[in-house]
Amino acid sequence: MVKLVFARHGESEWNKANLFTGWADVDLSEKGTQQAIDAGKLIKEAGIEFDLAFTSVLKRAIKTTNLALEYSDQLWVPVEKSWRLNERHYGGLTGKNKAEAAEQFGDEQVHIWRRSYDVLPPDMAKDDEHSAHTDRRYAHLDSSVIPDAENLKVTLERALPFWEDKIAPALVDGKNVFIGAHGNSIRALVKHIKRLNDDEIMDVEIPNFPPLVFEFDEKLNVTAEYYLGK
């Protein structure tokens, strides 16, 4: 059976500080680096061999991908980076402490912004220091494509073309695939893979560790789903 392994990036410095991160390019914490290394070791123990890998354009996912491949002795595997695998854009919440945001806007409102499938958080100002509109890595994109805020619905809409153009064809071709990405971009793809409805995906959480494995038949029907080491 062909395998797809999702690894959410290890703990980031902003995860550690309980801040909304989104598209902010935050590095891994010491714990997160170790989680990525341990992910690679679990992959090696499981004997999973990859043909190609995909990740976002954010360093926490890129470093997780590189470390996981290195410690599974597969650092040579081709890696393609795409903004379509980025974390959900948290808009004006980016950089805010989650507890302080709850105090400012109310627990219920922040919960809706975080967990609702189709409610958008406040937009990020285009002159914000974390705005993608002035970030060189997105210079090739039309400005109308660059988000100022996203919910899970929008995250899936921008990740889905990459799934259909790159990931799914590789799986159909019998290739084992590694994806180093983010909690919400992985959740969005899991919703599509498992054909979950809008309510069912709200209860799905993706931990920083360990990696999540899907096995598929030739028609991309899920035949197995499990976390490595569990």
From Swiss-Prot:
GO terms for molecular function: phosphoglycerate mutase activity. Signal peptide: none annotated. The gene is gpmA. SUPFAM superfamilies: Phosphoglycerate mutase-like. Keywords: Gluconeogenesis, Glycolysis, Isomerase. Its EC number is 5.4.2.11. CDD domains: HP_PGM_like. The active site is at H9 (tele-phosphohistidine intermediate), E87 (proton donor/acceptor). It catalyses: (2R)-2-phosphoglycerate = (2R)-3-phosphoglycerate. Substrate binds at residues 8-15, 21-22, 60, 87-90, 98, 114-115, 183-184. SMART domains: PGAM. InterPro entries: His_Pase_superF_clade-1, His_PPase_superfam, Phosphogly_mut1. This is 2,3-bisphosphoglycerate-dependent phosphoglycerate mutase. It is an enzyme of class 5 (isomerase). It comes from the Bacteria.
